[in-house]
Design a protein with these regions (language model features):
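Histidine- and acidic-residue-rich, metal-dependent catalytic cores
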Residues: 34-185
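Sensory coupling linkers of modular signal transduction proteins
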Residues: 2-32
Length: 185
């Protein structure tokens, strides 16, 4: 009978140890997510510091994305694709869609009037630059799905459903859903 007592004791210790480790991993995961969101907020603040209009645009679009994804969740067409987690990631990633504007020179970004053709070509590079920044800075920090969503939103948010957008001239469902949502907002 002593053998059973030792076995039960070992199993109980193992269970509590495993539970303790799982709790620690969960706490660290939440801490990492908190840090990542702080980094994202810092990126958004950097954009806002360079261009006050873009900063206000970032806050508004993030709120609009949240409203739109919530409405889409109630639509039979998108209910299975837009989970609560997806909606939350798209809303958070919306803050980064214009991060590539950090690489746009001030004379273009802050120009009060219409851009020349040359300046417009410079401005059109911000989606690709934003996607690159997201991949390089968040690729090792954030979960793969979030990085994929943020990358797509930054890279494709100027594509048009009917075609004629940039940088890839995609159309319709060739454009990732997250980028289509961003383009509306």
């Amino acid at each position: 009978t002593y053998g059973y007592a030792v076995l039960v004791s070992d199993e109980t210790e193992s269970y509590y140890y495993t539970s303790h480790l799982e709790a620690k991993v969960s706490a660290k995961t939440h801490e990492i997510i908190k840090i990542q969101r702080s980094v994202i907020g810092s990126f958004a603040a950097m954009i806002e510091a360079r261009d006050g209009i873009t900063g206000l645009h970032i806050k508004n679009t993030s709120n609009f994305v949240k409203i739109l994804t919530h409405a889409m969740q109630n639509s039979p067409k998108y209910a299975d694709r837009i989970t609560d987690d997806y909606a939350q990631m798209v809303s958070a990633a919306a803050k980064l869609h214009d991060i590539g504007k950090i690489a746009v020179p001030d004379y273009v970004l802050q120009k009060p009037g219409k851009l020349t053709d040359e300046e417009y070509e410079i401005m059109k590079k911000h989606p690709a630059e934003g996607a690159r920044i997201i991949k390089e800075t968040l690729g090792k920090l954030e979960n793969d799905e979030y990085v994929h969503i943020a990358y797509n939103m930054a890279y494709y948010h100027h594509e048009k459903f009917a075609g004629g957008g940039y940088p890839c001239n995609l159309k319709g469902t060739e454009i990732p859903l997250s980028a289509r949502i961003m383009a509306i907002c």
